[in-house]
Structure formats: structure tokens, C-alpha cells
């Protein structure tokens, strides 16, 4: 009985200590969150509504600073030069991990930046041109695979770069299929090509093409997820077909190494509170971000980032572009 009481007391002290740690930190001036991509894009559009909610919770201005260029590297370098004082954070995705692994950063992003909180975790979807589907006669991903086996290289897939997250998703999902790769300089041009039937397939987050799907111009063929999406219950998912591909864009907040843990905990707690706000919940629905759990605190998000780093390291190594091997034995 005494052991039980002692154990309960210890647990209570641990919990209270954790709560006190975040409560000890009080933001006393403006907080900046750097977005590595431009105004109006998916990352920026995710961060701004969260920043507005954080402003009310923290009682301080929360500024979104867009620092673009270098596929996110310019923002990494910018934040790395700022003091780790708890007032400068940055938004990050797996795209930054891939830049790090390819050696385009002056430092090791994996070692010098700390996951604070995940905001959203979208589902990637392989979509098809309605015009191309009607012409070639397939209606599902399984039927498309059968078509490709009989007609090698007659199906094309658009991509921005083979060394980005979408490229990794495609390579996993289409492994073993003789499909023609077509590069596009921008997502808007690729979308237009898909709608016009000039390319057969592409992969992107559901948040970016929901409107085109609703209009009937493109058709979701495969969701890269553990289970079928509630939005598209008749669309096959990768896991049910035995395809090991569930990569989806995860957007979260990172802090420079050396940032006070109290500041990290305080911001994570504020994000968790904001994530429960009805306006944020509505944003998740409107943005198609409600199919997977979004918010994750420091420990859970760090674990997810580690898993993505391992997976993307393997992919980039196979592509021959790995410059940093964090898992070399």
C-alpha cells in the first residue's frame, strides 16, 4: 500500500512539474513563425489561421513571416541565424527533411531543429484525368495497373521533381509499373495538363485538388493511406492493395536547437488548445485535413519526424542523391 501511495505521489509530481514547466514561460513580445513558402500556398494558408488563434491564446502578436526560395532552404538558413530565445519558430514539412538529406543546408536540420507541434497531416491521392480514363477504359487503380501491364509506357504521370515528397509517394505506389514520367515546372501547369488529358496521373494532397475532383475534371484513383477516406469511400487505398505507401504532407512548427524548453512546451500547449477551437475544426474539414489526426505534441511529432527521416533517407539513397546518411552503421 505504501509503495502504491509513493508511486501515485511521484506520478503526481511529474505531471504537475510538466504543467508547471509550460506555465513558467510567458511570452512577453511578438512571436514570429517563419513560413518557407509564399503567401496563399498550402503551407501559408495552414499557418495563418493557426497564428490568429495563437495570438488570442498567448496574448501577443503572432506574425507569419514568409521567407521563400531554395525549396525551403532559404527559410532554414534565416531561422538558423536568429537567436534561440523562444520568439522565432518556423513551419516545416517533410520537404525540408529531403533538402537536409540531399545536403543543401549549411547545417544538419535534423540535429539543429526541434519538432514543437504538428498542425495537419494530409492524405496524398493519386488522381487521374477523366478524359484519359474514358479513352483508355480504366475506372479504378487496380484496373489502371492491369492496363499498364498490357500497354507499357502508354500511361503517363506528372511530377514536379523525383526528389520531392510527391515523387517519393509516386515511386512507392507505382513501383514495378512501366509508366512514363513527365516533369512540370509548376503545380498549376500540371493540374491543367491533367484536366486537359495531356497527362494521365499525378499525386497531390487532397487539400489542393478537392475542387477539381468536385467539378469532375479529375478522378481520385488511389488514396495513400491506411484506410479508405471518408470523403471517397469507393476509392481504393494503398494499404488494402498491399502497397507500402502512406506518405502525406505533414505541416508542423519547429524551433531552433537551444530554444528554452519552457517556450517550446508553452507554444505546444497553445497549439493544442487552438486545435480544439471550432474555427480550426471547420478549417480542417474545409481543407480536407480531417481524415487523419492533425495535432501532435513535441514527443509524438518528433517520433513521426524520425520515421519520415528514415523512410525518406532510404528513398533518396536509392535515387542516388543522398548526401547525409543519418543512419549509417
State where each predicted segment sits:
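Beta->alpha turn/N-cap motifs
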Residues: 91-96, 162-163, 186-187, 204-209, ...
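N-terminal (or domain-start) structured segment
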Residues: 23-112, 154, 163, 174-203, ...
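Hinge/capping helix and adjacent helix->loop/strand transition within the periplasmic-binding protein
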Residues: 27-30, 54-56, 78-86, 101-189, ...
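An extracytoplasmic/periplasmic, membrane-proximal ligand-sensing/linker region
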Residues: 28-30, 262-329
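Bacterial N-terminal signal peptides
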Residues: 8-16
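N-terminal signal peptide c-region/cleavage motif recognized by signal peptidases
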Residues: 17-21
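Positively charged n-region of N-terminal signal peptides that target proteins for export
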Residues: 1-4
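Periplasmic-binding protein-like
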Residues: 118-125, 222-257
